Every structure is written in C-alpha cells, then in structure tokens.
Amino acid sequence: MNIFIVGPMGSGKTTVGKIVAGELFLDFHDTDEKIENSTGVTIDWIFDIEGEAGFRKRETATLKEMVAMNSIVLATGGGIVIEEENRELLASRGTVFYLHTPLNTQVERTSKDKDRPLLKGQDPEKVLADLQKSRQSLYEEASDHIINTENKSGSEVANEIVKLVKNYG
C-alpha cells in the first residue's frame, strides 16, 4: 500500500505524511527532501541555477524512483501535479490524498519559510492565489480523496487519512 499526499505549499503535506506513516507503520518519504539529499543542494539553489523546468525534470525522475517502492507514505512537492506523467504515476501506484487548504492558511504558514523559490521576491498572497487557481483542478484530478484542512491540526488531518485507509484500503 502506497499513500501519496499532494497539495499546495503550506498545506502540511510533510507534517501530515510523517504522522500517517507513524500510525500505519509505513516508511515516510518526501520528494523535495529526496531531491535535496541526492543533489546536495537546496531546492532554492536548483531553481536559481536550472530554473523551474530543470527542477520539474528532477522532480519527475525522483517520483518515478519513489513510486516503484512499496508500503510508503510520500509527501510530494506542491507542483508535482503540473506534469500529466506525474499524475498518472501517482494514480497507478497508490492512493492519492489532496490536502485542500484555504489561501489564508497557506499565506500564514509560508510567511515564516524563506526556502520557497516560487515566492521569492514576489507578493506571496498573489503568487499563492495564482498557483491555487492554476493547480486546484489538477490536484482534484490526481486525487482519490480530498481532505479539507481548514481549521484542523496536522494530527486531525492525518487521522482522517488513517481512517479512510483503514476503511477503504
């Protein structure tokens, strides 16, 4: 059983994924962390040097490697759903949960984090709103389950996922 968590930056994918993995005794992985560990540089640096297109190529290669594993919880990068190939990989190898998160929550959570290349030197609220508009339908298309995270802690969201997995497999 593989559980894949998608959603925008600031939705809590990594936090929720770690809790779900612990509850279900599965290994936890994060695509962004894997990319940083394999390259030895930050996502921010990759964006600066290779641009978003270069990063997306690395992201797809990493996803191919990760979906070949079994019994994992995988937190993905916010833009993983942009590529149709990625959406197909996710759908074919596990159950996909979309963490639907209100814009104000994303703004609040990402305001403390300076390692968000897409927000660098921009108005974060406008960028996040634009990303939400362009990606929301892709998240929905890619997902088996949509989890509303509004006014919920990471533990509450994780518990919803665990219940769904236990009830529906």
Where in the sequence are the language-model features?
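Hydrophobic anchor at the beta1->P-loop junction of P-loop NTPases
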Residues: I5
